[in-house]
Amino acid sequence: MVHIVGAGPGDPELITVKGQRYLQAADVIIYAGSLVNPALLKICKTDAAIYNSATMTLAEVVAIIEKAEQEGKMTVRLHTGDPSVYGAIQEQMDAFTKKGIAYDVVPGVSSCFAVAAALKQEYTLPGISQTVIITRNEGRTPVPDMEKLRKLASHQATMCIYLSITMLDKVVAELIAGGYADDTPIAIVQKASWPEEKIVRGTLATIVNDIADKGIDRTAMIVVSRCLGADYELSRLYAPEFTHMFRKASQ
């Protein structure tokens, strides 16, 4: 069987308990070598066959897994973050289905949540934003017209923008064109949860200059939100006058 496992954002301790258990038991591991922390591989069996998918095609990945299945071996396909977010796992799962290979998916901590932890920031503040948009700027992978940054910006929601740091100037221009004000807070977090994590804060008007000398050109998340440093309303969940199914109002 194949277990598609989310490795989490980088810190080896942020893999799930189930993901760790599968990784420790696997006979074959195929990992996204350019993104997954190699420290995770230290918990694998000493005789496990380990492959770096960064140099492989889809057909090569599937061929290794198919051979492992024929030999009765368990495979872990180790992806960074959560496999369902920009993980390119659908084409793999479809290939497994066509070949009759059983598989499951173990979710992981996506980098947008590691970024929130690094920033010590909640993305959904009452009166500010109750929506989080996970997206990317258009690059080699096309983006549907209704999902272009300019149109998503009209919602004024918290936005977590993946895979776009090399196009930061274009991202900023699209966000402003879509309705965000120049003074909207923005944060760039590189390698969230890794020892070499970097955080740069600014506004849409300043951020391109703010990161110019920081050496941030890959593996970084862009977060734009009024939640970043904003005044906000207190949640009703803990208000003394608020009643819910577990607690009656005290005022």
Residue ranges, per PLM feature:
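Class I S-adenosyl-L-methionine
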Residues: 1-109, 208
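A contiguous loop/helix-start segment that scaffolds small-molecule binding in enzyme catalytic cores
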Residues: 2, 71-75, 131, 139, ...
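Class I SAM-dependent methyltransferase SAM-binding "motif I" and its flanking Rossmann-like core
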Residues: 11, 82-155, 198-201
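Short secondary-structure boundary/capping segments
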Residues: 20, 42, 67, 123-125, ...
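Short, active-site-adjacent cap segments at secondary-structure transitions
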Residues: 37, 84-86, 112, 194, ...
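Residue-level signal for well-ordered alpha-helical positions
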Residues: 42-43, 118, 174
